[in-house]
């Protein structure tokens, strides 16, 4: 039997073969096909600026098949949620692949652990929002409703690395027909190491018998396969997060070359909300938020949208030359 | 220098010594002292049934000091959040030690990832809740406001195992003055293994150099120290979660004896919302929820409140005999 060309062969293929199959796979595939069909061909001169797949939040690595313990990656989903809002504002349709429970577009302002603190009951038991929060809550409800009602936002949740990579593969191959109109904005914090499903403990690991030793395998580098096979014409933006600033830009440039990204956005854990560096084959651009009240994502998305439209134009020029 | 008697010496002491100190320690200590003082002496014949410390959600084990990756324990916080509601209803004051981002009392009904789906804007831009949800949202706001306004709910958040155990120690020693009026209801999913802070990687672990090997140490068993030193007269309820039903009750009984708990609540991952078994020195009691619309916690808390009031009475009888 020939290797499935969408899985990239080798390590990636065996990763997908061993992964527990995605629940709701058929429903997700249907929703995806509808969403892409509805928005394909409307880019370029059309109303829509493009279709972007935003990934957001951290993936987990289960340590047990009936999972009690897992390794997680730090990520609130703030970056992906904020970016989704700015992509929608810029006229994109967004496929939002997000970690269950992570930050959601238009909900970022909410108090983390008690949404009830936002509300009070009026004298006639009507639900009221204190004046101080009313404007921001109303704007959030309005923008969210608009995105949903106009069919511009498709939300696909994941928890594990297995779910995430299967979703990315499905979205990647579904968006291939969009060619250069498609963009990937890969802000999720993806596990580098995992325990292969078949070698995983079936039950909760016993704690009575001394220290725990674990060996984890490397997750196959799917960026490469996304770029080469799933959606080769798309505009690809990936992220590189490090805690050590001395190696950050160097690693971002290595990723740019190794995976053929259009942009690698480099950020440090200590100040990722304040500043990012866009690394491209033309050099580096530092993006800083003007103040603590602003989002660094606003300017970042502006710049990326511009670069993406150049990426689309390039094709149009190429086509023009041929005719 | 003599060993600090509140830390339990040995392993526990070295765990606390090496742990990064709790942020806001002074503020938390102040809030705790106020809360306990306000509610002490009001139990027994008084208005208040008692003071309970409910722990909820999973603890994380950081794998790096500037933490990007961590091991997490599966727990939505559903059990602790629901139980807190029923304890408040039964007339308890509740200290709710919860994992940041986990389920909160009176918010359990919310759609997990999009609270905005609950709301819409009316014609005059007023915030409306669709009729279908209005009753439940209003009840939630009313009950939550009542608990907060009457000072019956103190919420203390944690993320890591280091924060959790430091909070438990602070609450344990602060509640000691309540004697038998105090209850611990330890529903949090606490890590069994951890990486000692001083042996932890400082920066994000590199992924380029092949598989990852990790060795994790056992977390000292703090239940024992809670029972023996921090709050020896309190009524103590702990939980035992397993995925393998064959070893569950046996492990629950071992925990009952080993840590001197009053009750160990045994539950299986597969059906923890449907059924639990209360294990005590007098035997086992199975608690099942009557239907999917009910909470198993309702009956569980009823039974525990009854047992706790017997535990309090016992002291009163002992005192009576002496006079």
Swiss-Prot record, chains A, B:
Taxonomy, superkingdom: Eukaryota
This protein's UniProt keywords: Coenzyme A biosynthesis, Ligase
Pathway given in the UniProt record: Cofactor biosynthesis; coenzyme A biosynthesis; CoA from (R)-pantothenate: step 2/5
Molecular-function GO term, any one: phosphopantothenate--cysteine ligase activity
GO biological process, alphabetically ordered: coenzyme A biosynthetic process
EC number: 6.3.2.5
InterPro entries given in the database record: CoaB-like_sf, DNA/pantothenate-metab_flavo_C
Catalytic activity line of the entry: (R)-4'-phosphopantothenate + L-cysteine + CTP = N-[(R)-4-phosphopantothenoyl]-L-cysteine + CMP + diphosphate + H(+)
Family membership: Belongs to the PPC synthetase family.
Function: Catalyzes the first step in the biosynthesis of coenzyme A from vitamin B5, where cysteine is conjugated to 4'-phosphopantothenate to form 4-phosphopantothenoylcysteine.
Subunit composition and interactions: Homodimer.
Protein's recorded name: Phosphopantothenate--cysteine ligase 2
Organism: Oryza sativa subsp. japonica
Lineage: Eukaryota, Viridiplantae, Streptophyta, Embryophyta, Tracheophyta
């Amino acid at each position: 039997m020939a290797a499935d060309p969408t899985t990239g062969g080798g390590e990636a293929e065996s990763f997908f073969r061993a992964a527990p199959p995605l629940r709701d796979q058929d429903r997700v595939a249907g929703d995806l096909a509808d969403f892409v069909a509805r928005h394909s061909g409307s880019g370029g001169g059309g109303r829509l600026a493009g279709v972007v797949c935003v990934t957001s939040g951290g993936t987990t690595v289960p340590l047990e098949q009936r999972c009690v313990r897992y390794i997680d990656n730090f990520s609130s989903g703030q970056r992906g949620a904020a970016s989704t809002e700015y992509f929608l504002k810029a006229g994109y349709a967004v496929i939002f692949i997000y970690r269950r429970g992570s930050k959601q577009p238009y909900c970022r302002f909410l108090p983390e652990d008690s949404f009830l603190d936002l509300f009070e009951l009026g004298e006639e038991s009507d639900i009221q929002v204190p004046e101080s929060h009313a404007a921001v809550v109303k704007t959030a409800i309005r923008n969210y409703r608009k995105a949903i009602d106009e069919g511009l936002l498709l939300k696909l949740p994941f928890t594990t690395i297995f779910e995430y990579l299967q979703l990315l593969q499905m979205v990647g191959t579904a968006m291939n027909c969009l060619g250069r109109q498609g963009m990937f904005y890969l802000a999720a914090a993806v596990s580098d190491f995992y325990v292969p499903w078949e070698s995983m403990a079936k039950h909760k690991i016993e704690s009575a018998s001394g220290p725990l030793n674990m060996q984890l395998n490397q997750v196959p580098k799917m960026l490469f396969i996304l770029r080469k096979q799933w959606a080769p014409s798309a505009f690809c933006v990936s992220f590189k997060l490090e805690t050590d600033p001395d190696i950050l830009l160097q690693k971002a440039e290595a990723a740019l070359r190794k995976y053929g990204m259009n942009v690698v956005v480099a950020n440090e854990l200590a100040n990722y909300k304040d500043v990012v560096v866009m690394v491209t084959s033309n050099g580096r651009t530092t993006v800083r938020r003007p103040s603590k009240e602003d989002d660094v994502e606003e300017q970042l998305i502006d710049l990326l949208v511009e670069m993406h439209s150049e990426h689309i134009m390039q094709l149009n020029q190429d086509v023009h030359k041929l005719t």
